[in-house]
C-alpha cells in the first residue's frame, strides 16, 4: 500500500529525473579530455614527437583554441618548432566628417577571380604576305575562333579590315619570333591558358584546335610544349627535341611565364638558323621541357603537303589533321578549307547518326517503350492543343494549287517559294524511298494524290504526302504503288539577323496629301500631330500637300477651300514658335499616288525619313518611334496595317475618342496601305528601277501606289504588320472611279470588309428578314 502510494507520488517527477540524467550524460560525452602543458619548452634533440607533458589535465571543447605553443603554423613541417599566433587587426572607426577609403575593385569579376580565357592564336606573318595569305587565314580561321592576332614585322600602308594586326618592328625570323613572345607575355600573358603559334603559310583546322584546347587542362599539363617533334639540326646529342614551327606550336601559359626571364639570354646566346629550333633550344635550356606530340591520349596530328599535291576531298587524313603545311597561295588555302569543312561536316553527321541510334536504343528501356522517343529523334514532340482554338490547321495542296490562300480565296496557284517548297518536298520524299528500297525496287513518281502541311512552332513545317508511284524491279516488272509519306522540315538554330543600327532619335518627316473633300479631317490630324510631336519636342516635321481640283484652283484667290486648314497651321506655328509646317499646292483632277510622291520627294534630301499618312491617321508617340525603328535605310520599308472601326450601325456603340481595340469593334485593314515609313533614297532607287525595267512607265504610274512600287521594284524587305497604335474611327471612304482597276478593287474590298464582321452582318440580315416577314 505504501509502495503504491510512493510510486504515485514519484511518477510525475520521473521524466524530469530521466531528462536531467540524460543531459549530464550527453554533456560528458561531448567533452574531449586532453593534456595541456603549463608552459612551452624548447624541443631537445632526440625527443619524440609526442606532445609534452604538463602538470594539469584539462577538459577542452572541440571548437576552442589551444594556446599558441600547441598550434603550429599551417603548412610548416612537424618538428620545426615554429609557433603560429593569430594577428589581431585593430578596428579603428572612422572619425565624423572623415572620408572613408573605398575598396578598389576590378572592372570585371573574371579579373578578380583569376578566370582566364582558353586559347589565343598568334599568326606569324609579314608585310609581304599579310594581304594574301594573312587574309586567307583570317577568312578560314577568324570566324570560328574568337581571339586571333596577326603579328607582322612592319605595318604596311593599308591594313586589311577586320583583322587584329600588331607591327613588331622586326622582319628577321628569329628577332620576329622573339618580339612575338615578348608581346604575348606582356599583353596577353595573364588572359589565356594556351597560346598557339602558327605561320600564315599553314592551314589550321579551327574545330579540331578548339576541341584540343577544350580537352587540355593546366592542372595536368602545366609545362606543355606540343607540336610536331623534330631532332635538333647538326646531330646535337642534347636530349629532347623541338617542335617544327610550320605545323604550329601549342604552349601553356605556365611554360611561357617561366620562359620570360630567359628570353633576352636566349636571344643573345643561342645561335640557330631556324626560329622554331631557336625556340626549342630556349625552352629546353630554360625549363628542361622538350617537344612532345602526344598528351593524355591525344595525338597532335598534322598533314605535310608535297609540292604540287592536289587537294582531294574525302582524303581520310583531313578527318584527324589539325594543321596542313605548306600552303602555296590563298586559292590553295581555300581549297584546303573546303576539304577540311567537308570532313568536319561528315564527322558531325556521323555523330548525329550515332546519337540518334543511342536515343532509339535507350528509349526501349523507358516505361512507354519506343513511344517515349519523338520522331524524328532529337526534335520536340508535336504540340498538344489546350483547347479547340489552339488546334494547328493542316493546309491542303497539290502540285499546281494551294487551297489555303493569304487573300482568303479558296484556291490559288502555287508560285515562288511555295512552289519551290512543294517541289523540294516531293524530291526529298522520292529520294528517301529509293534509298530505303533500292536495289530491290526502283520507284518513280506518277503524281501527288494529296498533300497536307502545317507549321508547328515547336517543330517546324510538317508534311503528309499521298504519292502515286510506279515500282520497277530488276527483272523489268512494273506495278502501281500508293504510299503515304510523312516529312518534317525542322527549325534550325535561331539566329539574330544582323541589321544596320537604328535609333528612336532619327528625325521624321510626316507627309499628308489632303484632298478638298477631306479638309474637315485636317483639324483633328493637326491636333494629334501637335500632341504627339510638337508638345514633347519630338524630332518630327510635317509637310502638307493640298490637292486642288481645276475649278477650285481657279477660285483659290477669292474663296480658298483650304483656308481653314492654312489658318489652323498658322495657329500651330504661333503656339509652338520653333515649329514650321510648310504646304505645297497641286492642281490635279485624278491624283496619282506615285506622281504626288515624286513631287514630295524632290522637295526633301535623300536621307529624309518619310512617314506617309492619311487624314484619318491618328499619330501617337509609340507609332512614331516604331516608324523610326522599322524603317531602315537601304534595308527595310515599313507598311503598317491600321485598326479600322466597324460601321456604327453594325458594331456595338462606342463613345468619343479612339475606337476600342477588339474583335467585335473593328478589324485590321489588310487592303489599305495609306500609312508607310521609308527613306527618300530608297524611294528614289525604286523609281529608278521602275523607269529602267518597264517601257509602260506612264501606265504604271497611274496603276501603282507606293506599296506596290516597293514590292515590285525594290530589293528592300517590305515589313507588313499590324499596328495596334493606329486606331481609326469608321468613315465612309469614297472610291474614285478614276483610280486604276487594282487600286479601285482594293478600295472597294476595304470598304466592304470595314462594314462589320461576318457574324454581325449575318445577324443584321437575319433581323431584317425577320422584320420583313412580319
UniProtKB/Swiss-Prot annotation:
It catalyses: 3-O-(beta-D-GlcA-(1->3)-beta-D-GalNAc-(1->4)-beta-D-GlcA-(1->3)-beta-D-Gal-(1->3)-beta-D-Gal-(1->4)-beta-D-Xyl)-L-seryl-[protein] + UDP-N-acetyl-alpha-D-galactosamine = 3-O-(beta-D-GalNAc-(1->4)-beta-D-GlcA-(1->3)-beta-D-GalNAc-(1->4)-beta-D-GlcA-(1->3)-beta-D-Gal-(1->3)-beta-D-Gal-(1->4)-beta-D-Xyl)-L-seryl-[protein] + UDP + H(+); 3-O-{beta-D-GlcA-(1->3)-[beta-D-GalNAc-(1->4)-beta-D-GlcA-(1->3)](n)-beta-D-GalNAc-(1->4)-beta-D-GlcA-(1->3)-beta-D-Gal-(1->3)-beta-D-Gal-(1->4)-beta-D-Xyl}-L-seryl-[protein] + UDP-N-acetyl-alpha-D-galactosamine = 3-O-{[beta-D-GalNAc-(1->4)-beta-D-GlcA-(1->3)](n+1)-beta-D-GalNAc-(1->4)-beta-D-GlcA-(1->3)-beta-D-Gal-(1->3)-beta-D-Gal-(1->4)-beta-D-Xyl}-L-seryl-[protein] + UDP + H(+); 3-O-(beta-D-GalNAc-(1->4)-beta-D-GlcA-(1->3)-beta-D-Gal-(1->3)-beta-D-Gal-(1->4)-beta-D-Xyl)-L-seryl-[protein] + UDP-alpha-D-glucuronate = 3-O-(beta-D-GlcA-(1->3)-beta-D-GalNAc-(1->4)-beta-D-GlcA-(1->3)-beta-D-Gal-(1->3)-beta-D-Gal-(1->4)-beta-D-Xyl)-L-seryl-[protein] + UDP + H(+); 3-O-{[beta-D-GalNAc-(1->4)-beta-D-GlcA-(1->3)](n)-beta-D-GalNAc-(1->4)-beta-D-GlcA-(1->3)-beta-D-Gal-(1->3)-beta-D-Gal-(1->4)-beta-D-Xyl}-L-seryl-[protein] + UDP-alpha-D-glucuronate = 3-O-{beta-D-GlcA-(1->3)-[beta-D-GalNAc-(1->4)-beta-D-GlcA-(1->3)](n)-beta-D-GalNAc-(1->4)-beta-D-GlcA-(1->3)-beta-D-Gal-(1->3)-beta-D-Gal-(1->4)-beta-D-Xyl}-L-seryl-[protein] + UDP + H(+). One of its GO terms (cellular component) is cytosol. Highest activities are measured with Mn(2+). Can also utilize Co(2+). InterPro entries: Chond_GalNAc, CS_glycosyltransferase. Residues 37-103 are annotated as: Disordered. The keyword Cytoplasm applies. A divalent metal cation binds at residue 616. It is an enzyme of class 2 (transferase). Residues 54-67 have a biased composition (Polar residues). Its cofactor is Mn(2+); Co(2+). Residues 1-15 are cytoplasmic. Keywords: Cytoplasm, Glycoprotein, Golgi apparatus, Membrane, Metal-binding, Mitochondrion, Signal-anchor, Transferase, Transmembrane, Transmembrane helix. Belongs to the chondroitin N-acetylgalactosaminyltransferase family. Has both beta-1,3-glucuronic acid and beta-1,4-N-acetylgalactosamine transferase activity. Transfers glucuronic acid (GlcUA) from UDP-GlcUA and N-acetylgalactosamine (GalNAc) from UDP-GalNAc to the non-reducing end of the elongating chondroitin polymer. Seems to act as a specific activating factor for CHSY1 in chondroitin polymerization. This is Chondroitin sulfate synthase 2. It comes from Mus musculus. The lineage of its organism: Eukaryota, Metazoa, Chordata, Craniata, Vertebrata. The gene is Chpf.
Amino acid at each position: 500500500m505504501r509502495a503504491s502510494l510512493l510510486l504515485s507520488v514519484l511518477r510525475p517527477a520521473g521524466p524530469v529525473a530521466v531528462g536531467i540524467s540524460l543531459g549530464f550524460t550527453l554533456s560528458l560525452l561531448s567533452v574531449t579530455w586532453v593534456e595541456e602543458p603549463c608552459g612551452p619548452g624548447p624541443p631537445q634533440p632526440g625527443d619524440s614527437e609526442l606532445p609534452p607533458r604538463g602538470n594539469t589535465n584539462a577538459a577542452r571543447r572541440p571548437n576552442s583554441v589551444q594556446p599558441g605553443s600547441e598550434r603550429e603554423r599551417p603548412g610548416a613541417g612537424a618538428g620545426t618548432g615554429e609557433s603560429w599566433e593569430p594577428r589581431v587587426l585593430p578596428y579603428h572607426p572612422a572619425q565624423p566628417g572623415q572620408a572613408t577609403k573605398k575598396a578598389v575593385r576590378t572592372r570585371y569579376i573574371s579579373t578578380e577571380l583569376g578566370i582566364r580565357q582558353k586559347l589565343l592564336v598568334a599568326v606569324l606573318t609579314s608585310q609581304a604576305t599579310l594581304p594574301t595569305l594573312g587574309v586567307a587565314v583570317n577568312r578560314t580561321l577568324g570566324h570560328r575562333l574568337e581571339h586571333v592576332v596577326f603579328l607582322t614585322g612592319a605595318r604596311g600602308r593599308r591594313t586589311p579590315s577586320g583583322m587584329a594586326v600588331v607591327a613588331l618592328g622586326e622582319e628577321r625570323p628569329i628577332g620576329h619570333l622573339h618580339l612575338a613572345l615578348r608581346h604575348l607575355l606582356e599583353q596577353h600573358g595573364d588572359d589565356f591558358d594556351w597560346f598557339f603559334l602558327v605561320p600564315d603559310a599553314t592551314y589550321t583546322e579551327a574545330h579540331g584546335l578548339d576541341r584540343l584546347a577544350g580537352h587540355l587542362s593546366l592542372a595536368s599539363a602545366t609545362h606543355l610544349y606540343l607540336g610536331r617533334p623534330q631532332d635538333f639540326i647538326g646531330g646535337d646529342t642534347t636530349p629532347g627535341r623541338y617542335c617544327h614551327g610550320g605545323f604550329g606550336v601549342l604552349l601553356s601559359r605556365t611554360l611561357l611565364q617561366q620562359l620570360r626571364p630567359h628570353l633576352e639570354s636566349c636571344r643573345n646566346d643561342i645561335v640557330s638558323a631556324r626560329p622554331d629550333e631557336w625556340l626549342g633550344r630556349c625552352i629546353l635550356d630554360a625549363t628542361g621541357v622538350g617537344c612532345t606530340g602526344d598528351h593524355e591520349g591525344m595525338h597532335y596530328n598534322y598533314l605535310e603537303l608535297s609540292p604540287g599535291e592536289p587537294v582531294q576531298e574525302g582524303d581520310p587524313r583531313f578527318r584527324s589533321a589539325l594543321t596542313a603545311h605548306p600552303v602555296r597561295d590563298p586559292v590553295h588555302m581555300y581549297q584546303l578549307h573546303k576539304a577540311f569543312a567537308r570532313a568536319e561536316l561528315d564527322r558531325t553527321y556521323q555523330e548525329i547518326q550515332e546519337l540518334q541510334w543511342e536515343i532509339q536504343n535507350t528509349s526501349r528501356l523507358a516505361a512507354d517503350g519506343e513511344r517515349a522517343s519523338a520522331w524524328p529523334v532529337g526534335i520536340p514532340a508535336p504540340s498538344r492543343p489546350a483547347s479547340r482554338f489552339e488546334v494547328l490547321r493542316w493546309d491542303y495542296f497539290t502540285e499546281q494549287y494551294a487551297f489555303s490562300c493569304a487573300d482568303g480565296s479558296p484556291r490559288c496557284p502555287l508560285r515562288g517559294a511555295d512552289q519551290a517548297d512543294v517541289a523540294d518536298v516531293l524530291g526529298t520524299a522520292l529520294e528517301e524511298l529509293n534509298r530505303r528500297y533500292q536495289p530491290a525496287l526502283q520507284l518513280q513518281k506518277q503524281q501527288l494524290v494529296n498533300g497536307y502541311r502545317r507549321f508547328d512552332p515547336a517543330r517546324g513545317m510538317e508534311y503528309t504526302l499521298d504519292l502515286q508511284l510506279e515500282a520497277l524491279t530488276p527483272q523489268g516488272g512494273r506495278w502501281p504503288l500508293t504510299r503515304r509519306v510523312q516529312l518534317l522540315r525542322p527549325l534550325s538554330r535561331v539566329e539574330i539577323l544582323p541589321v544596320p543600327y537604328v535609333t528612336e532619335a532619327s528625325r521624321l518627316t510626316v507627309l499628308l496629301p489632303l484632298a478638298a473633300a477631306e479638309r474637315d479631317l485636317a483639324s483633328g490630324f493637326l491636333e494629334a500631330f501637335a500632341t504627339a510631336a510638337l508638345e514633347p519636342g519630338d524630332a518630327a516635321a510635317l509637310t502638307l500637300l493640298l490637292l486642288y481640283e481645276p475649278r477650285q484652283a481657279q477660285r483659290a484667290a477669292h474663296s480658298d477651300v483650304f483656308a481653314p486648314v492654312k489658318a489652323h497651321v498658322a495657329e500651330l506655328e504661333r503656339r509652338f514658335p520653333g515649329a514650321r509646317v510648310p504646304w505645297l499646292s497641286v492642281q490635279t483632277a485624278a491624283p496619282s499616288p506615285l506622281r504626288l510622291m515624286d513631287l514630295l520627294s524632290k522637295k526633301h534630301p535623300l536621307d529624309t525619313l518619310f512617314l506617309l499618312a492619311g487624314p484619318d491617321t491618328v499619330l501617337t508617340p509609340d507609332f512614331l518611334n516604331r516608324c523610326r525603328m522599322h524603317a531602315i535605310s537601304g534595308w527595310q520599308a515599313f507598311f503598317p496595317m491600321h485598326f479600322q472601326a466597324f460601321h456604327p450601325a453594325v458594331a456595338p456603340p462606342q463613345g468619343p475618342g479612339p475606337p476600342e481595340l477588339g474583335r467585335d469593334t473593328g478589324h485590321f485593314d489588310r487592303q489599305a496601305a495609306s500609312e508607310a515609313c521609308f527613306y527618300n533614297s530608297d524611294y528614289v532607287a525604286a523609281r529608278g528601277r521602275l523607269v529602267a525595267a518597264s517601257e509602260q512607265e506612264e501606265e504604271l504610274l497611274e496603276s501603282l501606289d507606293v506599296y506596290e512600287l516597293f514590292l515590285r521594284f525594290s530589293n528592300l524587305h517590305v515589313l507588313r504588320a499590324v499596328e495596334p497604335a493606329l486606331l481609326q474611327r469608321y468613315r465612309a471612304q469614297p472610291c474614285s472611279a478614276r483610280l486604276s482597276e487594282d487600286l479601285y478593287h482594293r478600295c472597294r474590298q476595304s470598304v466592304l470588309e470595314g462594314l462589320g464582321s461576318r457574324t454581325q452582318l449575318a445577324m443584321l440580315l437575319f433581323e431584317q428578314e425577320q422584320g420583313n416577314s412580319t
